[in-house]
């Protein structure tokens, strides 16, 4: 080999191109790529900066979420770089927009540690959302291959086993959040739990921010709550539960609280989304080993899931949480006070409940998904709902859901037990009408009025809340069809 600089440079350039070159040219754009069954697929909504080609922007997302950095590095030659590069293989304009694009990206399964939501997310959403060439970026959907799902535990209990444990079949579960969420003493807290369960509810729950504050420490809350559960079971003959929030500052504290809850005899514990993916997976594994139902409150999700052009769609969180091992997750109400377009909510529920998903663009489902026998997650509908909406809730959300009437139980003028009874009677009257094949949606208001003739608490609730609703336009709506975004 010649020792001249020119000759060494020529040979190097034939083998390896250095410097800053476009991501698309580096191999992160491949429109001919044949997607493998084992690939992890992601769909991003990409909003490039003015002047940035959408294909180059999509290739940049693929590169920065897999193996690339800002310049070519020679150590690529020490890896199977052609295999490990993520490939943007399809870029489509988003309907009815001028500067948004759907980028389909494939990742080889070997890029990810088996069974680790933390590692999966570190690549997919780890760094790329701050990329300057893109003014906004949103992760809309993912396909997780069966080969990867087989390394994941999935829900600790699942809805089928939960129904068997709770002895509740043929209708939604009922349960509100204790209100006010903060400030009650342990004894008063337990009284709220007892009254709600005694009145006919299946569950009560802690709220997301009740942990162990000076006005009520966690152990005090657990003791009074379980006393209430046991007394209500004795009084009604029904299986009851209370979601005990074990969220804490360390895993050691969470395990301690969960173990104490188990010793008290609870059938369900609760955690918050804000504890993080590793902590959620860890608690899912604990719950499976200890035959415990695991409820997840989605606290904090709207900071990144609500806006349409940046962040992450809630359906992706649903997929990750089904993998992580939770049994419940709040997933929207349609008619309540929180964000919820009807088609988007249906897509979330399908993601949590179906064994296989087909592509359904109006509901925001971009990929087929085989869940590989992972158990089903029960969606939770909570926030601004009341018994006067029971026909709508049953129609939109179906049987497999927890309907949580917090203010709609505890705000009843005649007390908590009356509020619980109103909700139970409203639900059972609507389920009976449905099972009789009546048009319970159209007849819903009259069905409730008829039931109220023999249930004073229901009549009082209907008189109080009437047809109150939170009629605001949703921010996260379908891209492929027009959809009613306000409550209907």
Swiss-Prot record:
* Family the UniProt entry places it in: Belongs to the RuBisCO large chain family. Type I subfamily.
Function of this protein? RuBisCO catalyzes two reactions: the carboxylation of D-ribulose 1,5-bisphosphate, the primary event in carbon dioxide fixation, as well as the oxidative fragmentation of the pentose substrate in the photorespiration process. Both reactions occur simultaneously and in competition at the same active site.
Q: Fetch the NCBIfam families from UniProt.
A: PRK04208.1
The species is: Antithamnion sp. (Red alga)
Protein name, UniProt field: Ribulose bisphosphate carboxylase large chain
Q: What cofactor does its activity depend on?
A: Mg(2+)
GO MF term list: magnesium ion binding; monooxygenase activity; ribulose-bisphosphate carboxylase activity
Location in the cell reads:
Plastid, Chloroplast
Q: What else is known?
A: The basic functional RuBisCO is composed of a large chain homodimer in a 'head-to-tail' conformation. In form I RuBisCO this homodimer is arranged in a barrel-like tetramer with the small subunits forming a tetrameric 'cap' on each end of the 'barrel'.
| PANTHER family membership | RIBULOSE BISPHOSPHATE CARBOXYLASE (PTHR42704), RIBULOSE BISPHOSPHATE CARBOXYLASE LARGE CHAIN (PTHR42704:SF17)
Binding positions for substrate per the UniProt entry: 127, 177, 181, 298, 330, 382
- Keywords on this record? Calvin cycle, Carbon dioxide fixation, Chloroplast, Lyase, Magnesium, Metal-binding, Monooxygenase, Oxidoreductase, Photorespiration, Photosynthesis, Plastid
Does Chloroplast count among this protein's keywords? yes
Gene Ontology BP, a term = reductive pentose-phosphate cycle
Pfam family name, one: RuBisCO_large
Q: Which Gene3D superfamilies match?
A: Ribulose bisphosphate carboxylase, large subunit, C-terminal domain (3.20.20.110), RuBisCO large subunit, N-terminal domain (3.30.70.150)
Looking up PROSITE patterns in the UniProt record yields: RUBISCO_LARGE (PS00157)
Q: Which gene encodes it?
A: rbcL
Please tell me which top-level EC class this enzyme sits in: lyase
Reaction it catalyzes: 2 (2R)-3-phosphoglycerate + 2 H(+) = D-ribulose 1,5-bisphosphate + CO2 + H2O; D-ribulose 1,5-bisphosphate + O2 = 2-phosphoglycolate + (2R)-3-phosphoglycerate + 2 H(+)
Location of the active site: 179 (proton acceptor), 297 (proton acceptor)
Gene Ontology CC annotation, any one? chloroplast
